[in-house]
Structure formats: C-alpha cells, structure tokens
C-alpha cells in the first residue's frame, strides 16, 4: 500500500511540475509574441544635406569630420575672388545705367516741356521710349547686381543649425558644383527612435504611451513617449504592369508574415551623439504609465532580458 501511495505521489508531483512548466512556457510565449515590443528599432535624427548654391574651387575648409558646430559657423568657403569681380562688374553696370537714365530723363523732360511747337510728336515719343528702355535696362542691371551679391554671400557655407558634421568629403582645392552634397549635418537635440512594430502588436501602441528603449549592447534603459504611428506602409505584394493592370504576388494562405509599421518615439532626454543615428535598440511599450521595475516578478525580469537575445 505504501509503495502504491509513493508511486501516486511521485506521479502527481511530476504531473504538477509538467503542468506548471507548460503554463510558464505558454505565458512566456504569449508575453514574448503578443506584448508590444520590438528589437527592430533604430535611433534617428534630423539630418541636413548641405550643398552649395554656387560652383567653384573650394578655398578653405574650416571644420573636420564629426565635429560639433554651432549655428552659422563657417564650414567651408568657395572661390570668392571670382564672385567679387562678378559683383563689381554688376555694380559698374548699375552705375552706368543710372547715369544714362538721368540723361535720358532730362532729355525727355526738356522735349515734353517744349512740346509740339518746337518739335514733332514723333521726336517727343522717341525720347520717352528711349527713357523707358533705359529704365528697364537699369532694373535688369540692379537685379543682376542683387543676384551677384547673393552669390557672393553664398560662397561662404555656414551651418544651418547646431549639430555634428559627418561624412565630410570635400577638401581645399577641389571643384564643387552647384547642388552637389558636400557634407551632412546631424542636428543636435533632434534624436528620436524609429521602432518598426509588427502589425499584430499595434493594439498596444498609441500616441502618448510610454516606452522603454534599450540600446544594443547596453544595460541602460532610456525613457520615451510614442509620438506617432505611421498611417500607411507600402504594399510590396501589389504592383502595376506596363498597361496599369494590378499585379498581385502569390501567397501561401497558411503563412502570413506580419507587416512592420514605423512608430516614432520621442526621447525624454537627449543623449547627444552617444548612440548615433542608425544604431539599433530594443523598444518595449509599457502603456499609459512607466513600468515599475522594482515591482516586476522574476519571470517578467527574465522575459525582459530574453528579449535582447531573440
């Protein structure tokens, strides 16, 4: 009898342990697959592609790669003597047409005062037409001068905002064309996190919800707030042929891959360039309030850590 009782006890204990293990595994699976989190997240920032509005030889480069610069700080300078001469030529044209316009204005005024008693109407009209032509030429010369002045100002390339110079690929002596990107500027205090959440987890993602961001390779947890959720993503399964007809890719009905939707997360505190734009992180959406880690059970703490590996 004792032997039977002992066997039943062992069987019951084993069964209970198996059931508990199954429950733990099931809860872990649900927590892992359905709670709003993703390892596919990246730090991002506002980046300005700086390109000159004038062409010419680069005479000075005043910064080095990855340097922190202030707004309006000079980055590099393009061939100023050429544009200074162009401005001087334009100013000379303006001065010439100003003198010529004054002469033609006096001539037209004199003929208009004398009237048809001293000369023909044709001569009077001709003087007025010449004056109008010279005034138009003066206006054109003034516009050319203003453009030359603007070009001269734009030979000095300045930082549009505080930030870090990155991917600097210009050097003194090189010729740069108008509109060609010379350097990128990563704006200071513009960093945010772009999390690519699976569509099956969007139910737990809303603007204003709190988020935890763990950079890859770091134990530090940053705090943030969901700023916005993308309103749409590209449908890669549908395209159009040459005649505009829809082309739909074949899918296996029993295999459905969840689409990923960009979610923008605003950081509570800017971290400088400690985690550069493009680096990866794990994001967990905790809901309307921050998660109190001190109140988490061992199971939840373990689950949070396992997210870093899967």
UniProtKB/Swiss-Prot annotation:
Transmembrane segments: 12-32
Single Gene Ontology BP annotation: transmembrane transport
Pfam family, one: HlyD_D23
Topology class, membrane: Single-pass membrane protein
Lineage: Bacteria, Pseudomonadati, Pseudomonadota, Gammaproteobacteria, Enterobacterales
Designated gene of the protein: aaeA
Family according to the record: Belongs to the membrane fusion protein (MFP) (TC 8.A.1) family.
Compartments reported by the entry: Cell inner membrane
Keywords recorded for this protein, A-Z: Cell inner membrane, Cell membrane, Membrane, Transmembrane, Transmembrane helix, Transport
Family matches, as HAMAP family: AaeA
A GO molecular function held by the record: transmembrane transporter activity
UniProt keyword Transcription present: no
Functional description taken from the UniProt entry: Forms an efflux pump with AaeB.
Species, as recorded: Salmonella typhimurium (strain LT2 / SGSC1412 / ATCC 700720)
Protein name: p-hydroxybenzoic acid efflux pump subunit AaeA
Database matches in InterPro entries: CusB-like_dom_1, CusB_D23, MFP_Efflux_Pump, PHBA_efflux_pump_AaeA, RND_pump_MFP
GO cellular component: plasma membrane
Signal peptide: none
